[in-house]
A protein has these predicted regions:
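Short, small-residue-biased leader/transition segments that mark boundaries at the very start
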Residues: 1-3
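Function-dense linear segments that define catalytic or interfacial modules
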Residues: 19-146
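Short, solvent-exposed loop/turn and secondary-structure capping segments
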Residues: 61-63, 120-126, 155-158, 166-169, ...
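Extracytoplasmic/secreted proteins, especially bacterial periplasmic and envelope-associated proteins
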Residues: 78, 82, 86, 102-109, ...
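Inter-helical turn/loop segments and adjacent helix faces that build the functional surface
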Residues: 94-98, 159, 210-214
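Secondary-structure capping and boundary motifs in well-ordered enzyme cores
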Residues: 102-103, 139-148, 161, 191-199
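Alpha-helical support elements that line or immediately flank enzyme active sites
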Residues: 109-122, 142-165, 204-210
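Helix-terminus loop motifs that line ligand-binding clefts
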Residues: 128, 163-209, 213-216, 221-227
Length: 230
């Protein structure tokens, strides 16, 4: 379950939550698969800013994440500038020569898409594992669409995001340790809707290209489990 901490820059005229068909005014927290919240602003409110922190660990962690990622005094414009700077830093790793403007738009759009997933799932040194329902110390990545990405995206990430590759392999090994086998498409837990064991190719390709900063023996065991049971 994902928790969210919301901070509004404008006063609220009304607020509350709902769960299933029950609406409770004045309440600020609710949990469930069919739950949510609502707010209303005073008449005449034309503009406001909303800051959101999210966490798979806890509501308290969501607040901590928000405090670390968006300063209280940061405006929307300042936050946009900070994010744009971060993306420009990543996308500037490759410089194109030649081609048309349309060609460059296509390339950098695709480049941007490749850096979306797998996504970092850990929260400042800890992560919630949907495979065993526990909070662990360490790094975690999730949302691997492996039968789509094992051929090209993961080898590509070895070139443009090499600092993340070992942690991505570590995350696959952790999924095996916490759930029993490496999933075909963790999103965020087992989905069981893809064929094959394409994580094997991702791990093997990383290994032969020199990425070894993970538990290699455990990775091999995980591959063997997949080979024997899928």
């Amino acid at each position: 379950v994902c928790s969210s901490d919301l901070k509004f820059s404008a006063d609220l005229a009304d607020y509350g939550v709902w769960k299933d068909s029950l609406v409770t005014a004045g309440k600020t927290q609710e949990a469930g698969t069919s739950a949510g919240g609502y707010v209303a602003f005073p008449a005449g409110t034309e503009m406001m800013e909303l800051r959101i922190g999210s966490s798979f660990i806890s509501f308290e962690q969501a607040g901590e994440n928000l405090a670390k990622e968006i300063q209280k005094t940061a405006s929307f414009g300042q936050t946009v500038k900070k994010v744009r700077t971060a993306w420009n830093r990543s996308l500037s790793k490759i410089k194109l020569k030649g081609g048309t403007e349309d060609d460059r738009v296509v390339f950098y759009t695709a480049f941007f898409h490749t850096l979306q997933y797998p996504r970092e799932f850990s929260e400042y040194g800890r992560y919630y594992s949907p495979f065993d329902g526990k909070v662990h110390e360490g790094v975690s990545y999730n949302a691997y669409s492996l039968w789509d990405t094992f051929r090209a995206e993961h080898p590509w990430l070895q070139l443009v995001a090499s600092e993340r590759v070992d942690d991505m392999i570590t995350s696959l090994v952790q999924m095996y340790e916490e759930g029993g086998w490496i999933p075909k498409w963790p999103n965020p837990t087992y989905t069981n809707i893809m064929i094959g064991t394409h994580a094997d190719a991702v791990i093997a390709d990383a290994y032969v290209n020199g990425f070894r900063n993970y538990d290699v023996e455990q990775a091999y065991k995980a591959i063997q489990i997949g080979r024997a049971h899928v």
